[in-house]
From Swiss-Prot:
Inducing or repressing factors: Positively regulated by the two-component system YycFG. Expression is maximal during exponential growth.
Alphabetical list of InterPro entries matching this protein: RlpA-like_DPBB
The protein's name: Uncharacterized protein YdjM
Organism: Bacillus subtilis (strain 168)
GN (gene name): ydjM
Length: 123
């Protein structure tokens, strides 16, 4: 009888713990550097997906999140602007760590003529 009670308790505890999702910020990635824009909208990204306004490219060999990864990009604008884009391409980017579409770049609070802005991204 005692064995059945202990077994039932283990099952109850195990099923309760299984209902929770444990995530750690330690696994989150934070990348500092310039954010630039490129006109990839409508073109095929490295993921094979047709790129939209909220897709982005990360720097080849520098940071390699999976295709489709949700990325939060932060520009050091005042007030601070944040956009959400999705990694579906890669590029060489000699002066940047993230490329976004013109629409996404403007959403960071800068005109396209600025070209690049200091910031960071995380996922």
């Amino acid at each position: 009888m005692l064995k059945k009670v202990i077994l039932a308790a283990f099952i109850l505890v195990g099923s309760t713990l299984g209902a929770f999702s444990f995530s750690s910020d330690a696994s989150a990635k934070h990348v500092n550097g310039n954010i630039t824009w490129y006109n990839g909208v409508g073109k095929k990204g490295s993921s094979g997906k047709k790129l939209g306004h909220w897709d982005c490219a990360t720097k080849i060999g520098f940071d390699v999140p999976r295709n489709g990864t949700k990325i939060r990009a932060y520009a050091k604008a005042k007030p601070k602007k944040v956009i959400t884009v999705y990694k579906n391409d890669v590029g060489r980017m000699p002066n940047a760590v993230l490329d976004v579409s013109p629409k996404a770049f403007k959403a960071l609070g800068y005109p396209l003529s600025k070209g690049k802005v200091a910031g960071h991204y995380s996922y």
